[in-house]
Each structure stands twice: as structure tokens, then as C-alpha cells.
A protein has these predicted regions:
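A domain-level signal for the structural core that forms small-molecule/cofactor-binding pockets
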Residues: 2-189
Length: 189
């Protein structure tokens, strides 16, 4: 089969259609990313842009620690804590808020209408109510629709990773993952 024919059979999903929350909400993209998209720039934030956010968050977290009575400026164990926490949020814990998800390519199911199951997908997220870690495993099962698509197993992992790295409550995270897979695979729910 020629490459052209393969590409015409693929379905590449518009990642913006996968958004489940308003920008700036705990389980949505950041207001920074929203502003880029509104300007027509469909890209993730650059390292330089992230450094500006880290700098602002670092100052705010220092004030937060001071409000809690932590003398972080003089405690050798806490001196760098505001910067470390800010970097952890932007570059790891909430990186899904600052990044456009990678394109997910789905392929025709070619009449396959059985269940597709991926178990034990590791997830690290953060509860948006209490900012506590959510650690666990996700199990995904779906049945492609009549004219549905099949999503590669590694793509299911990417979907979980992307939405997990935003911060959310577990119920909203479940809905976001479900909606993404239903949209991409064109399931009949």
C-alpha cells in the first residue's frame, strides 16, 4: 500500500476538540496557553515562557510559605523550596496545562467490533481541590463504532498522561479521558 493511501485512511484528531474545561479551570489548559491559541498560535509554551511563569509562581509560593510561618529565606532546607515547587508544577505535575497534546492518529477498525482493552496504565495526577497527589492505574476499554477507529495502545497511555498532568478531580479526569477516546475512536459509547 502506498504511503498516500495509508495517510488517507488515518484520522488525525484536532486536539482542541478534546478540551473538557474552560481555560484556567483546574482541569483545563492554562490561561497562558489559551491566549496563544486565541492568537492563532497552536503550540506549547516555550521554555522561556515557562521560566516566566516559574518566576512568578516562585515569588507567590515564597509568600505562601511566609504566611504559614515558614522562615524559608533563612532555613537552609527550605531556601530553594519556592523555586523547586514552581518548577515541579510547571515542568511536571501540571505540564499538561502548558502543552498542546501530541496528535493522536487513529486507524480504521476495518470492521472490528470487539472490545479493545488496555490495563494498568500508570497515572500521576493532582487533586484540584486539595493539591494532593493522585497515584494509580487506569484501565481503558472501548468498542470502535460501526465506522469507528482504532487507537494504538501507546496512544491511550499518552491520553491518560496528558489529562492526568493538569490537576483535576478524579471524576472530571475520568470524563476527560472518556471524551478523548470516544472522539478519537468514534465509539458508540
Amino acid at each position: 500500500m502506498s504511503k498516500e493511501k495509508v495517510n488517507t485512511r488515518r484520522k488525525v484528531v484536532d486536539v482542541e476538540k478534546l478540551e473538557t474545561a474552560k481555560a484556567g479551570f483546574a482541569n483545563g489548559i492554562s490561561t497562558y496557553l489559551k491566549d496563544l491559541i486565541e492568537k492563532g498560535e497552536h503550540r506549547s509554551l516555550t521554555d522561556k515562557e515557562k521560566l516566566k511563569i516559574i518566576s512568578k509562581a516562585e515569588k507567590a509560593y515564597g509568600k505562601f510559605l511566609t504566611a504559614l510561618g515558614v522562615d524559608w529565606e533563612n532555613d537552609p532546607n527550605s531556601m530553594e523550596t519556592p523555586r523547586r515547587v514552581a518548577k515541579a508544577y510547571v515542568n511536571d505535575l501540571w505540564r499538561g496545562r502548558y502543552e498542546i497534546p501530541t496528535e493522536i492518529t487513529a486507524f480504521p477498525s476495518d470492521g472490528y467490533n470487539g472490545i479493545i482493552l488496555e490495563r494498568d496504565i500508570p497515572i500521576t495526577s493532582m487533586c484540584s481541590h486539595h493539591h494532593q497527589a493522585i497515584l494509580g492505574k487506569v484501565h481503558i476499554a472501548y468498542i470502535p463504532g460501526t465506522d469507528g477507529k482504532v487507537v494504538g495502545l501507546s496512544k491511550l497511555n499518552r491520553i491518560v498522561e496528558h489529562f492526568g498532568r493538569r490537576g483535576s478531580i478524579q471524576e472530571q479526569l475520568t470524563v476527560a479521558i472518556h471524551n478523548a477516546i470516544s472522539t478519537i475512536a468514534e465509539t458508540e459509547n
